[in-house]
Amino acid sequence: MDHEHLVELAEAHLWGHFTAINNNVDGMRILERGDGCYLWDTEGNRYFDGLAGLFLSQLGHGRTELAKAAGDQAAILGYFPIWTYGHPTAIELAAKLAELAPGDINRVFFTTGGSEAVESAWKLARQYFKLKGQPERTKVISRNLAYHGTTMGALSITGLESIKTMFEPLVPGAIKVPETNHYRCPMCQDEPHCSLHAADAIEEAILAEGPETIAAVFLEPVQNAGGCFEPPPGYFQRVREICDK
């Protein structure tokens, strides 16, 4: 199918993510293949994929061994829910992830994507405390400018107002604290490195909301969509101390 016809079909039928449905797609780039870190469009232009396919193609495009593994699995068993059943590949992968995970993390709950993973984690935290006889623990804490997904619960935890306003009101109980942006931090402008003020703000939020109402704290290792903010040394250790307290 030629490029012009693909553009016509896209204009009539394709609704791109994070894109208004009435956006004019005339002249849009249509990517048709990839190899390593490069992509090619339907007009033969080559691009460097610096985004790694939205961070999910770190191993590169065109990996035939990965395609073969996926095809082999689909030929044996394409899909079956792991409710009260299991299957060898899921069990083996869960065991491998448990082996690689730090500390006593040894259980794996598979999801289909990041937003669903965040939703599931919030649900897990709520269910845990309800079973512990603490049903009032429903709130979660996350950072300003954080990105945790776009489904309703995950979007509530997300701290990017520009992608939230059209879907409000969102799920209540998602509390925000400062991000670790040293460049614009009013609390440590005169310090050579960002201090732990942002971590201490989590404790302040817990006390303000009531510790008996908090179920979980959601933090990206490095904030990405909000500006690539690396936390200062000791940040996560301090957060761990606060949560344990």
Residue ranges and their predicted role:
Residues M1-D35, A198:
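Active-site-adjacent loop/helix segments that line or gate small-molecule/cofactor pockets in enzymes
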Residues H3, R46-Q134, I141:
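Glycine-rich loop-to-alpha-helix module at the N-terminal edge of alpha/beta enzyme cores
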Residues A10, A70, I242-C243:
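A generic structural signal for well-ordered alpha-helical segments
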Residues M28-D49:
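Active-site and channel-lining beta-strand-loop segments
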Residues F48-L51, P178, A216-V222:
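Short beta-strands and strand-loop turn motifs
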Residues A95-A215, G234:
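PLP-dependent aspartate aminotransferase-fold enzymes
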Residues Y183, E220-P233:
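Conserved PLP phosphate-binding loop immediately N-terminal to the Schiff-base lysine helix
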Residues F229-K245:
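Catalytic PLP-binding core of fold-type I/II PLP enzymes
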